[in-house]
Amino acid sequence: KLVYDPFAGSGTTLVEANALGIDSIGTDISIFNVLLSKVKTADYDIPLLEKEIYDILKRLDAYKNKFSKDEKVNKLFSTKNEYIQKWFAPNTQKELLCYSRLIKDYTYQDLLKIVLSRSARSARLVTHYDLDFPKEPQTKPYQCYKHQRFCQPVEEAYKFLSRYTIDTLDRVKEFSKIKTKAKVIVNHADSREVELPMGIDMVFTSPPYIGLIDYHEQHKYAYELLGLKNNEKREIGPAKNGQSQQAKQDYIKGINDVFLHTRKYMAPNALALIVVNDKYGLYKAEDAGFKEIGRVERHVNRRTGRREGAFYESILIWQKI
């Protein structure tokens, strides 16, 4: 049995396949998504991880106490990066950069990078109700729609770094109880041309929605802090391309190219389950070498941030022909 996700994203398909004892492969054009998927599905020496987790927090706390007293320490953790200077308060910058510098001393560097990026997301100068698509930094107190009161801009990262470091350890421990020895492979590549093994039994994926999200821009805090390579020019259907007729044509060509390529590696009669928001009716199974044998509609009511209107998804069930 082999499951494939050509739009691996944060690795949900890979995690669930492993828990079920099924070998899986994921591909994503975003190196941040690849890093996240690898961290979620990696094997860990739990006692060593626990030791490293508490050690980095202890060292961060020691440096944190010197920030207001020692100018040499302050200079160690400064940056000329315009994005970091714009979107993080001065003290937040120091704490994030300190944690970042300490990561190189540990075995599980990729996991600590994910903790850093997760903390950075929460520690930005943004409103609590607009973590997904902030347009400008929030530097003054504001009326918070999420908490129904006035809230202050975030001025520290330490509370997030501490909370998420421990939380990540807890998540790894929890997943280790059900993790199997099933293989997980994560490719950093374009799904339209990536080389795959023959005999894929099932594709389970959720392609990007047309004109909704600029996926690299959405995680820019991670790209800037971790120095990751940006591949946004290879994204399919990014928000900046809009939802014009031309954008729709480009989008569905990109999607069909992915499935036509993937199809070559699939077993006879193999299934593809595709979660989409197909309000424009762009998905035609026959154009990608499949036939549609079923469709399930679902209302999505668990989302971060404030978004207008009801949101629906379809689960397309396609079979290779």
Q: Would you name each region that the model predicts?
A:
Residues 99, 109, 240-295:
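Conserved Class I SAM-dependent methyltransferase catalytic core
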Residues 32-102, 227-241:
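Conserved phosphoryl-transfer catalytic core
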Residues 91-204, 210-213:
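SAM-dependent nucleic-acid methyltransferase catalytic core
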Residues 277-321:
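Class I S-adenosyl-L-methionine
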Residues 23, 183-185, 291:
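Conserved beta-strand segments of alpha/beta enzyme cores
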Residues 38-39, 101, 215-218, 285-286:
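Short amphipathic alpha-helical segments
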Residues 3-20, 24-31, 37, 112, ...:
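Conserved proline-anchored active-site loop of SAM-dependent methyltransferases
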Residues 197-202, 208-268:
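SAM-dependent methyltransferase catalytic-core segment centered on the flexible catalytic loop
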